[in-house]
Amino acid sequence: MVTPGNIGSFTVWDYVVFALMLLISAVIGIYYAFAGGGQKTSKDFLMGGRSMTAVPVALSLTASFMSAVTVLGTPAEVYRFGSMFSIFAFTYAIVVVISSEVFLPVFYRLGITSTYEYLELRFNKFVRLLGTILFIIQTVLYTGIVIYAPALALNQVTGFDLWGAVVATGVVCTFYCTMGGLKAVVWTDVFQVGIMVAGFSSVIIRAVVVQGGIGPILNDSYYGDRLNFWDFTPNPLQRHSFWTIVVGGTFTWTGIYGVNQSQVQRYIACKTRFQAKLSLYINLLGLWAILACAVLSGLAMYSIYKDCDPWTAQFVSAPDQLMPYLSLDILRDYPGLPGLFVSCAYSGTLSTVSSSINALAAVTVEDLIKPYFRSLSETKMSWISKGTSLIYGAICIAMAGLASLMGGLLQAALSIFGMVGGPLLGLFALGIIFPFVNSLGAVIGLLSGFAISLWVGIGSQIYPPTASSSLPKPLSLEGCNFTSFESNWTTTVMPMMTTLIPEVSSRPELADSWYSLSYLYFSTLGTIVAVVVGVIASLLSGGLKQNVNRDFLLTSQDFSYLNVLFSNCKKKGQEEKVEVLNWKMRSTDTDMDQGTDNPAFNHMEMSSTEKKEKMNGIIA
């Protein structure tokens, strides 16, 4: 039975574990600042010299977006809404296949540093600038959320000053990211994934022991309606269903893994294309492992608190504080383990923030500085990259203040990626899949998708969906012992949300329809609008007349399974030709270099003749 004030507090050993995690992360950054001669060029700093291998990159990919938002938000999601969130296991598999077979081949073939370099090659400088600005806005906002999340956990379980913890998070992360570049980020991610799994495991194992085995946990979850894996309701207004998670989640996470600089920068830093693809598929195993840990933690939390919900009882002020509360409650007799869990949440944030800062520095240097200051030496560009990392670290710390105003961390984080990531995904899809889409169509499509997704996203924040669409599960106070309270809390209740939802009379008609769209469909909506509008605008503005460089498009050879399937069916002399999907080869086309593993060239340094031919994606 849970009673107020009955949880433990941080001990010396907890602080030791926590400090050790920070120290090791910082040491890794210092090591890679000097290892191998240090970060002599911007390519060394931003891309690790394009010499990374699959396993560390895979773990880094897993850690980058399995942040404190996952550590704190997903168990609370399962506790309140049930285990339907586990359907994301299917979504992750679909996303990895799309990313590795559609987007990775094109980006790797071009040997680019910033994904937005592709937009200039395929379209023009203005499209590249638009994509870069949207990415910077998206990433700074998201990073603010994931900095705030562990600070909230620390504040809840240790009494640390909330904003002091926010600053500490940003400073430590910015330090090792600035010192060691991409290699430091990747290898600290490897270490931090281990900490995340260890932290989750300590909570799960102890919960199983406390509850007498995994059986009682599953039994409590079943009778509490938490094992609600399947709900095929097609209603797009319902917060989570099979379709919102699989369809909406696929668009949201493809925007992250397929075209987001933070992820793409890692796998195109691999030394071969095979290693790059392998890193994505190994990363899938990591995603499944972290998801399983988070879901099991949520079910264990419900089993322990099924008769006395700490949130409704006001032992915690927000659902995202439930996991740190649980860790102190059940691990208080084991010095060091509460510190391990807080380190788990903190590790998730350090990995995500460092990835974001490194990506922000990359797009700023490659897209906003290098094209206009080409006379700068590589040494100077390396120092500029480090300075840019410092600046973005400070900006992200400042933006963490907004996170305190955005409600649930998990939904807020995915909503941001939906509102901005969806239109960006549509933009890259227009360039890679549709050879007739021109620059005008790309701009109109991007802005249309962004306007629509921003409209519904902001509307949903102002007028949150009602409980009828979010479908929270009942929580109980029957087992609480409120000896200091006059009221007798002995009934099953739903947490009150009236302070978050305006009165029905003040809600416009769109509030219960358009603004109540599942947050996972924000990305789907933005992508579809961007693609449809972009295609129509291009057709109306003469897009069919252009002849696009085939290196910028998806080809049949880019599908690895097609290469194996048809390898024995090619006629002699055809091996060097490239068949572009949905594209008729013209007599003026010539065979283009298909790129090699570990591309070392920089297209911005190509000869002026080649540059004119490839600029805007049109062959002169």
From Swiss-Prot:
It catalyses: (S)-lactate(out) + 2 Na(+)(out) = (S)-lactate(in) + 2 Na(+)(in); propanoate(out) + 2 Na(+)(out) = propanoate(in) + 2 Na(+)(in); pyruvate(out) + 2 Na(+)(out) = pyruvate(in) + 2 Na(+)(in); acetate(out) + 2 Na(+)(out) = acetate(in) + 2 Na(+)(in). GO terms for cellular component: apical plasma membrane. Residues 37-51, 108-128, 183-184, 261-283, 358-389, 437-438, 541-620 are cytoplasmic. The chain crosses the membrane at residues 16-36, 52-72, 87-107, 129-149, 162-182, 185-205, 240-260, 284-304, 337-357, 390-410, 416-436, 439-459, 520-540. One of its GO terms (molecular function) is monocarboxylate:sodium symporter activity. InterPro entries: Na/Glc_symporter_sf, Na/solute_symporter, SLC5sbd_SMCT1, Sodium:Solute_Symporter_SSF. Residues 1-15, 73-86, 150-161, 206-239, 305-336, 411-415, 460-519 are extracellular. Glycans are attached at residues 219, 481, 488. Acts as an electrogenic sodium (Na(+)) and chloride (Cl-)-dependent sodium-coupled solute transporter, including transport of monocarboxylates (short-chain fatty acids including L-lactate, D-lactate, pyruvate, acetate, propionate, valerate and butyrate), mocarboxylate drugs (nicotinate, benzoate, salicylate and 5-aminosalicylate) and ketone bodies (beta-D-hydroxybutyrate, acetoacetate and alpha-ketoisocaproate), with a Na(+):substrate stoichiometry of between 4:1 and 2:1. Catalyzes passive carrier mediated diffusion of iodide. This is Sodium-coupled monocarboxylate transporter 1. Belongs to the sodium:solute symporter (SSF) (TC 2.A.21) family. GO terms for biological process: acetate transport; chloride transport; iodide transport; lactate transport; nicotinate transport; nitrate transmembrane transport; propanoate transmembrane transport; pyruvate transport. It is found in: Apical cell membrane. Keywords: Cell membrane, Glycoprotein, Ion transport, Membrane, Sodium, Sodium transport, Symport, Transmembrane, Transmembrane helix, Transport. Pfam families: SSF (PF00474). It is a multi-pass membrane protein.
